[in-house]
Amino acid sequence: MLIGLFTELNGTGGVQRASRHLAAVLSEFAASRHLDYRLLSLNDTRELHRMSVGGKEFVFTGCERSKARFTATAIRAARRHGKVVLAGHPNLGPVAQAMRIAAPRLRTIICTHGVEVWEPLPAVRRLALGQANVVLAPSQDTANHVAEQHVRRERIRVLPWALDPEFEAIPANAPQGKLPHGYPEGRVILTVGRWLASERYKGMDTLITALPRLLTRWPELQLLAVGDGDDRAWLEELAEKNGVNRHVHFLTGVSFDELAACYQACEMFALPSRGEGFGLVYLEAMARGKPVIGGAHGGAPEVIEDGVTGYLVPHGDAAQLATSIETLLSDQAMAQKMGGRGRQRVEREFRFSVFAKSLKKILREQCES
């Protein structure tokens, strides 16, 4: 039996999207080897869920935030001829470790994402990482941080996340889709994320403080932030203090088709974050042929080629961010070329099939060990 442990599979964040990809590949691999599989989600509602990624359907059980139920179910699954457990987040590493105590032959794979391993982990999580057979990291930068948690280098594997198959299915020359209500008129800088006070490292505030300089030359410029969170009021207040509140817009409850249309319609995508372990939203924008601006930190430089598919800027440097945006706004032909190169890179390196092939190889190695 193959077992997958996840914090949440129904959510909208990057961790949830990556988790769905992991779950889809694990279930498909199990079927190809005529093995049973069991997928558990800690935070999803207590029922049997059905989900599909890239046309591949899988089922999982939600545990409605009950750590006791989640752990007990995982240990029972391990005792039923468990071969490999894949924990989709370091927070679940201790559960995988408990499963291994109950079923000593069980092989363990733990996935990391980025910022959660940038600081020393609690001892129990660090121990679980150190004793895992494989620790996955979406970028070399994240892998380096994992190694600082006293994980042996030979156990760390870099597995870049993939573009969601829904985005892959959109042709490069697809007509402009229907935009959501509230999409602003003018030249639009798009950013996508969860705007939380605990995640100000995303750099949304820097985008706002860069706007006054840009608006002196392009008064039609608009900043559109797709997503919501507890920091929205603070960001709106910051926009008002900078005199740009009429040029900063938030959209929530956006469907997939509407989000794809936003990527298609915008001039560029910007998320000058210092805390991206990888950055799935960069892939989404690149797949729609848009130049991308990201932070010169974390895993973003492994996705964005500076001066080729977009620009990398130091976190919090509003002047450098404004300069990069000015360059793209001033030369639309160059911006389109950058976007085209980004699309080509996604098609070459970050397709879901590439991710699936790499993960299946790791699963096969662990099953045969």
Language model segments and positions:
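Conserved donor-binding/catalytic core segment of Leloir-type glycosyltransferases
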Residues: 4, 182-202, 208-211
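Carbohydrate-associated surface elements
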Residues: 141, 162
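Short alpha-helical donor nucleotide-sugar binding micro-motif in glycosyltransferases
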Residues: 129, 253-254, 261-266
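Conserved acidic donor-binding segment of nucleotide-sugar-dependent glycosyltransferases
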Residues: 306-307, 311-318, 327-333
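Nucleotide-activated donor-binding/catalytic signature segment of Leloir-type glycosyltransferases, i.e.
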Residues: 233-254
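Short hydrophobic beta-strand element within catalytic cores of glycosyltransferases
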Residues: 291-294, 304
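Aromatic "clamp/platform" in nucleotide-sugar-dependent glycosyltransferases that forms part
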Residues: 274
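A short, well-ordered alpha-helix in the C-terminal region of glycosyltransferases
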Residues: 220, 320, 327, 334-348, ...
